[in-house]
Regions:
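Positively charged n-region of N-terminal signal peptides that target proteins for export
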Residues: 1-5
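Bacterial N-terminal signal peptides
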Residues: 7-18
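Sec/Tat signal peptide C-region and signal peptidase I cleavage site
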Residues: 18-25
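Short, glycine-/small- and polar/acidic-enriched structural segments
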Residues: 26-156, 163-165, 172-178, 191-192, ...
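Pocket-lining segment of extracytoplasmic ligand-binding domains
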Residues: 84-85, 158-252
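Small-molecule pocket liners
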Residues: 102-108, 203-207, 211-212, 287
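Secondary-structure end/capping motifs
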Residues: 217-300
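Conserved C-terminal helix/tail region of periplasmic/extracytoplasmic solute-binding proteins
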Residues: 288-324
């Protein structure tokens, strides 16, 4: 196992011990769409802040994004963070998006010795984060634009884990987030290259919840969304707030110094490049165009109603209270 993978497991163990506990009937079950890592540390902190304001939560991390979405759809969880568009139309209002947390600032990566253009990938295997994820949406769009068809589709959750697979020669084409793309290129830029991707990125990770839970817990929903909007605003001004909050709350106490030192750099890069960016109604409209082209939504943009997919009142309240 690589050092990066070992540290990822340590992160997961540290957050799991802090964020989980006995669940009561009033506890909001939260399903995270990927294993806990540095990338989700800000989300963990926002949940902790909401808990301090009386929102009882228990967070569970799933190995695959589609499992987290299904947990919310089925009622095993009430709240989720993932990309739920692929199943939202079929679920007919079971869940509603609350706030966009991250954007699809991702890059297609290929092994230079094997592929040089998108055309070279016609009929070839390609690895994504998970079924129905933003990475697969990007792949679908680029395949459509390039008039190619992928061969076998493989799925490895987490950009850091896909880096390990690339370095070990297990995969030769995938899509990585911005920070991990930079890490890969620093380590092995002579072996790998980026291909053209999509511009004007849509929402990636979205905070969403069951509609029936929203209706019964509107005060809690307001607090939850407000804490995410507030923290993202603080992060935009000072990315080091994530490390400050980690220390303040005693999260990840056993985290190696090497990783702690990289946390602020990770969020600094993410904020600078627009990865961590909240959104509501403005995000919804661009999301429709993107996920329609990706095949994860059906119909025409003009036919899709924002209110069928989003409950915007908490986000609008938070922005009015805190400022954009």
């Amino acid at each position: 196992m690589s050092r990066l993978s070992i540290y990822a497991l340590m992160l997961a163990a540290g957050l799991g011990a802090t964020l989980t506990g006995p669940a009561s009937a009033q506890t909001g079950q939260v399903a995270l769409g990927e294993p806990v890592s540095v990338e989700t540390l800000a989300m963990a902190i926002a949940f902790e802040r909401a808990k301090e304001r009386g929102v009882d939560l228990k967070v569970t991390s799933f190995s695959k994004e589609e499992l987290a979405v299904q947990a919310v759809i089925s009622g095993q969880a009430q709240i989720g963070i993932a990309t739920p568009y692929a199943v939202m139309q079929k679920s007919k209002g079971t869940v509603k998006n609350l706030v966009t947390l991250t954007k699809l600032v991702f890059f297609p990566i290929v092994e230079k010795a094997t592929y040089k253009t998108w055309k070279d990938l016609d009929g070839q295997p390609f690895t994504f984060h998970s079924r129905g994820s933003g990475t697969e949406a990007i792949g679908n769009i680029m395949a459509k634009r390039q008039n190619i068809t992928f061969g076998q589709r493989n799925y490895i959750s987490g950009s850091d884990n896909r880096i390990v697979a690339l370095m070990n020669g297990q995969i030769k084409a995938t899509i990585l987030d911005l920070p991990n793309t930079k890490i890969l290129m620093e380590k092995a830029g002579d072996r790998f290259a980026t291909l053209p991707g999509v511009e004007n990125p849509a929402s990636d990770e979205i905070l969403f919840a069951r509609t029936d839970w929203i209706d019964k817990n509107k005060d809690k929903v307001d607090i939850l969304v407000e804490e995410f909007v507030k923290l993202w605003g603080e992060m935009a001004k000072n990315p080091a707030i994530i490390e400050t909050e980690r220390v303040k709350r005693g999260l990840l106490k056993d985290l190696p110094k090497e990783i702690v030192e990289k946390t602020t750099a990770f969020y600094t890069t993410g904020v600078k490049e627009g990865l961590y960016k909240v959104g509501g109604g403005d995000a919804a409209k661009s999301d429709f165009e993107f996920y329609l082209e990706a095949g994860q939504l059906t119909g025409a943009p003009a036919e899709l109603k924002v209110e069928d997919f989003w409950y915007l009142a908490p986000y609008d309240k938070a922005v009015k209270k805190l400022g954009s």
